């Protein structure tokens, strides 16, 4: 091998996007196809959601995320998990499929709109007995778990719900997660909006600045991002996977 030519070639490659792969839909599909395959019922649930709840299907947990969580829960040997923000049940399904038969997922949502869809697919995958669907205010139920003596007993907690409450969920989850367990926050980049300043004049940023209710959620996420980044109680990492995920474990 011509080592000098090889080095020059690498320099040229590095000069394009600083040597990083630009994440396109083609790249995402490639990585999904070369990761642990989704269970057939996961695929069925994705299709069912896209067909029957098209207007809200953007709330589905990303396929790459589900593959990532499958591996993560296996590494953790997880037997107890909490899913805050259930929607049509895909994330809870993924967690239950990754657990042994005596594993338990506490799935919390504040609406019953998708309850039938959840149970339909959980039963189809033979994991319905592992999942306890709780229709309640998530902050209230997390506190109930603490009051019932379950602090420090959960292996994995996934937060994908109302962004205004993320900070409250964080503090409650820190009490519930065991040492060595992981708390995961979804949508931490929020379409890229958490990188945009309020006073930005860039044309491409204006789409993020025209809706007060959206901006309120963005502000809550920005505060949480800074809080976690500077929180000495935890070890943390933020990943640009899908809409952004932050993983946290207690020191």
Curated annotation (Swiss-Prot):
Induction: Down-regulated by phagocytic stimuli. A divalent metal cation binds at residues 160, 186-187. One of its GO terms (molecular function) is S-adenosylmethionine-dependent methyltransferase activity. Gene3D superfamilies: Vaccinia Virus protein VP39. The keyword Nucleotide-binding does not apply. It holds the Pfam family Methyltransf_3. Belongs to the class I-like SAM-binding methyltransferase superfamily. Cation-dependent O-methyltransferase family. CCoAMT subfamily. S-adenosyl-L-methionine binds at residues 61, 83, 85-86, 91, 109, 138, 162. Keywords: Metal-binding, Methyltransferase, S-adenosyl-L-methionine, Transferase. This is Probable caffeoyl-CoA O-methyltransferase 3. It comes from Dictyostelium discoideum (Social amoeba). One of its GO terms (biological process) is methylation. Its EC number is 2.1.1.104.
